[in-house]
Amino acid sequence: MLKDASSTSIYGARASNGVVVITSKRGRMGEAAKITFRTQLGFSQLASKDWDQMDTNERIQFEKEVGLDKGQDYEKLSKININWLDKVYNDKAPLQNYELSVNGGTEKLNYYVSGSYYDQDGIAVGSTFERVNFRANVEAKANKWLKIGTNTMFTYQEVEQSDDGEYALWAPISASFFMLPYWNPYKEDGSLALQDDGSWKGTTENPLAWMENNPLSNKKYKLLSTFYAEATPIKNLTIRSQLSADYGHTTSFYRSFPSYKPNNNYGGAQRSSYDMLNLMITNTANYRFMLNDVHSFNFMVGQEGVDYHYEGFQVTTRGQTNDILTNLSSGSTASSWGDPVTEYSFLSFFGRGEYNYDDRYYADFSVRGDGSSRFGTDKHWGAFWSVGFM
């Protein structure tokens, strides 16, 4: 993590909140193939349930003291005592993670390939998370002065949850605070209490029934791939060119079942789909040398270009009359729609010089010029520089 001005100025306008430098795993040249399998099994739960909430007897006593006891059958209600923390949070939500990797190399090649699967139930009832991940890092020596490589990652993830509704009082976290202890979410036969038959006594929706009848699913695909070539045409000079592509595709599907009475026999569906593509090219030249074994110099110049594009759509229709046919085309009216588009580009030039005297004194200077389509029309370029001594 880079936070100081001297370290981050070389990254320009986008480094105002710091820079995170990530080093990916890779194999070692000349090392035999090594296969590694890891697995993780466990569970997650609410860190603490020691919340001082009223039970039914305390709630009844409170209502009597403040005059809210009119029309209440407390003899019947006193037989019900619901801890809503136990109803809307999973006590031990299971998780499982499996990872298989292979790494190694020859005299001219190193590689690291891995795949993983992660599955977890959320601590909130009705939520799940699933992810599949693949990664491949390969580097090869073309000759004595040139090496090429690629780092590629693909991720698929799926999230299931419930819509939180217009007011969110029946969302899991809110429900644990606002539902009263004598509001039983279940009938005597174990099925969910509903407003339809009067089995639900709450003044808002039954949170568990709402979650079941208003599901929301999200899916995300992400592909990040980087290709690079690094040359050392002469001693102490390193030239590197790198091209990366970051692509993401996200979809969501929300359904509101018409058979659920709070939906007023009026189903709904919402679909959204968004695509993002970020292309980046970076070229750098780095020259380092030493004089008299105590004076160390390092100079670097570079160029970077970024082209970003994001677009998608979101459509909501209402009027579905069948719980099975809750797609967009089954609705009678389109209640909302949108199609956002975002585009911008960057072009940057930068340089840095470093001096080190006998590992005792250090000085550096960096400068960067950023040109961006997001800057004002009267000033498309910005300069960023820093000087440091130590």
Predicted regions mapped to residue ranges:
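A beta-strand signature from Gram-negative outer-membrane beta-barrel systems
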Residues: 1-36, 95-97, 110, 116-118
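Short, solvent-exposed loop/turn segments at the edges of secondary structure
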Residues: 15-17, 276-278, 382-384
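Residues on the lipid-exposed face of transmembrane beta-strands in outer-membrane beta-barrel proteins
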Residues: 24, 100-104, 134-140, 225-231, ...
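Surface-exposed loop/interface segments of Gram-negative outer-membrane beta-barrel transport/assembly proteins
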Residues: 29-82, 122-127, 133, 137-222, ...
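Transmembrane beta-strand segments that form the barrel wall of outer-membrane beta-barrel proteins
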Residues: 39, 115-121, 363-375
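Outer-membrane beta-barrel initiation region
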Residues: 49-50, 56, 88-92, 102-106
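Conserved interaction-surface patches within small, structured recognition/assembly domains
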Residues: 95, 99, 119-120, 349-350, ...
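Extended, hydrophobic alpha-helical segments in both membrane/secreted and soluble proteins
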Residues: 134-136, 241, 281, 349-353, ...
